[in-house]
């Protein structure tokens, strides 16, 4: 009798374990469900105060760059505008975010920034409202760009003005490019064309 009870208990245990194992294989992990978000959830203000909805960029490759008017890297505006003009009709867009986080190199108002960009570099790519890209007052979009728990790819820190974030056609972060890397770098151009 004890042997039969043992066999029945063993069979029930094995069946229960098999069902639990199968359920855990088919059930996505919490990190996967909560993990990777996309850029399309964000709405921000542009330099004119109008709403800019990132969902309007679905299907395009996006370069997000934090900018400054009084930085040694400010001449990158010229290259940014050049690649924007060359590839904007081929599914690519640049979105600039002025930020005053590094040595107070973007002290101007939105209007002053807009005038500076147009007069000095002929900027036509979308430029957003001045935000913070670091610290306690970091904008939500930059939390997405810099936190693996939100972007599902990597943690990063904005090192300086003109750091670039490459977003694929699905709205997912794919690469972070250092500030000193020029927008015309072969790796970036290859990614745009790919």
Regions found by a protein language model. Give the residues of each.
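Thiol-/selenol-based redox modules, centered on thioredoxin-like
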Residues: 140-143, 147-194
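Bacterial Sec-dependent N-terminal signal peptides
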Residues: 1-26
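Thiol-based oxidoreductase modules, predominantly thioredoxin-like and allied folds used
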Residues: 91-108, 124-135
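Conserved helix-turn-beta segment immediately C-terminal to the redox Cys motif
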Residues: 60-62, 70, 74-98, 117-121
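Amphipathic alpha-helical repeat scaffolds
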Residues: 46, 66-70
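Short, internal strand/loop/helix patches
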Residues: 111-160
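N-terminal "domain-start" segment that seeds a small globular fold
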Residues: 23-55, 140
